[in-house]
Amino acid sequence: MAPLKMLALVTLLLGASLQHIHAARGTNVGRECCLEYFKGAIPLRKLKTWYQTSEDCSRDAIVFVTVQGRAICSDPNNKRVKNAVKYLQSLERS
């Protein structure tokens, strides 16, 4: 009987902890903000995709994702950034 009580207790605690973890992640879902911009050259051939940060962020940014999965925060007003976005959009169309 003791192993059954222990199993019930472990199941209850595990369920409660998973619910707590899920609730904590839910508060920031979809909210990724850039604190600073990348100032180096943008490696066009290594870019996979891009997205714009949320309006809730204090700094507007374009985030490029490389083929290695690295995120690069970029200034949306920068000419190189605009060219990189156009490049990726042209790849999507073809």
From Swiss-Prot:
GO (cellular component) term, any one: extracellular region
Tissue: Constitutively expressed in thymus. Detected at lower levels in the lung, colon and small intestine. Expressed in stimulated peripheral blood mononuclear cells, but not in resting cells.
Keyword Disulfide bond applies: yes
Induction notes from the record: In monocytes, up-regulated by IL4 and by GM-CSF/CSF2 in an IRF4-dependent manner (at protein level).
Top-level taxon in the UniProt lineage: Eukaryota
PROSITE patterns named among the record's database cross-references: SMALL_CYTOKINES_CC
Biological processes per GO annotation: cell-cell signaling; chemotaxis; immune response; inflammatory response
Record's signal peptide: 1-23
GO MF annotation terms: chemokine activity; signaling receptor binding
Protein name from the UniProt record: C-C motif chemokine 17
Gene: CCL17
